[in-house]
């Protein structure tokens, strides 16, 4: 952290060699990995070009895939781009890969309201 600045005020230097996950809107509960994450890697969460937090990868997360940005209980909507893109089929821990093994689609299903 830069002296005199809170974590929320830090501006991201794109040349910095830190692992980053991009949160696209304040409403999202998942972010996009900007490089491969190995289990145990610490990553910065970036929103609007600023560091808003850090987390640790609980699983491997490949470049371009989604990471949970907080604990997501089963049945909770998965939100990316401020839109629901699915629903958690099981509990998802913060820092875990979010993909077809732990989410289910909600579009075009006649059994959901």
How would you label these PLM feature ranges?
Residues 47-80:
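Compact, glycine-rich, soluble single-domain proteins
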Residues 1-15:
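Short, Lys/Arg-enriched N-terminal segments with co-localized hydrophobic residues
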Residues 85-106:
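C-terminal structural segments of small proteins and small subunits
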Residues 16-57:
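Extended boundary segments
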Residues 28-31, 63-65, 83-87:
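Short alpha-helix capping/helix-loop boundary micro-motifs
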Residues 11, 102-107, 112:
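Conserved "landmark" site that anchors the functional core of diverse proteins
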């Amino acid at each position: 952290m830069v002296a005199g600045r809170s974590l929320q005020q830090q501006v991201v230097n794109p040349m910095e060699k830190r692992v980053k996950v991009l949160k696209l809107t304040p409403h999202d509960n998942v972010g996009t990995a900007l490089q491969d994450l190995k289990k145990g890697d610490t990553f910065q969460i970036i929103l609007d070009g600023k560091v808003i937090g850090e987390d640790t990868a609980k699983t491997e997360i490949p470049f371009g895939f989604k990471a949970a940005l907080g604990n997501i209980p089963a049945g909770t909507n998965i939100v990316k781009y401020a839109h629901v893109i699915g629903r958690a089929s099981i509990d998802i821990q913060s820092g875990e890969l979010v993909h077809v093994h732990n989410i289910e689609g909600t579009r075009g299903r006649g059994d959901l309201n």
